[in-house]
Amino acid sequence: MYREIEFQGKFEKIKSCECIGEFEDEYVYDLEIDEEGYDNQTFFANDILVHNSNYINFGAVMNSCEFDYDPFEFVKRLNEYRLKEYIKKCYDIYAKKWNTDNYQDFELESLSYGGIFLGKKKYVLDIAWQDPNKDLFPKLSKIKSTGIELAQSGTAPFAREKLTFLLRHIFEKGKNFDIREFVKILKEIKNEFKVQKADQISIGTSVNNIEKFIINDTTKFEVGKGCPMHVRAAGYHNYILNNSKYKVKYSLIRSSEKIKYYFVKTKSENENNVFGYLNGSYPYEYAPPVDFDEQFNRIILDPINRFVEAMGYAPLSPNLLLVRALF
């Protein structure tokens, strides 16, 4: 399951261990090491390499040989008749250098019409083909996201829907993408955002350590140093409920429960700016008003700006005005 000589005593360095599939009675995991120098290590389970993928752009290769036919057929044949055997030989040479057998294999898993990469394990792809399928998926029919808001269970329903729509728009336009047109679409989405119910635009999460960070939620609202935002949101709910007439109808939020939370309007920077509530139990009688501008910035504008910047554009401002570069 791991290379014992290199990693003995290093288990405390493991950042995450994620099950990525089940194979009959066996399991395969993806391990991530949070330590400089161990980022490129490989892990094996049942002789299957489960750590790291490599994405390659074959556009320059195709242009260099003036290939005018199906690009996906080109890549498949290039892999089958040239790359597959070449990579195997390279692994064999590397293994021989270290006097060991080669157990690594590099397989073609998927082809994409396009992709945007934000960083390691943070990307979105417009999948065209995926092993073991024989046929291509229609363009924009299979969007794969990893490490971004679309892949996170706590993303607000409205945000998930609109981020998917915006990313599809980017892929559809391709080289014809127009940032001005994109801003107009965002403005329309923001107008629609402002009439949504809180449940549709709130962030979902589990909450713990309420007792640790919430110092006082009865006579006044006090939080401890380093209190996470979602814990503060839960504590603020309890404070308002404790000082209301609805303690029979609604329950206090306890550690290990699932909540949703959103940003609220405040009169000063010193006031608490987040409010949470139990999943499926929005307390409309005492819930403070949503700060729609801040909530929009956090769950839609900030995530989409990361893609805008990755495409080479300046990030869009909260007022959704284009800022021209001076130089």
Where are these regions (language model features)?
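Autoprocessing domains of the Hint superfamily
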Residues: M1-N52
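DNA-dependent DNA polymerase catalytic subunits
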Residues: S53, F58-F327
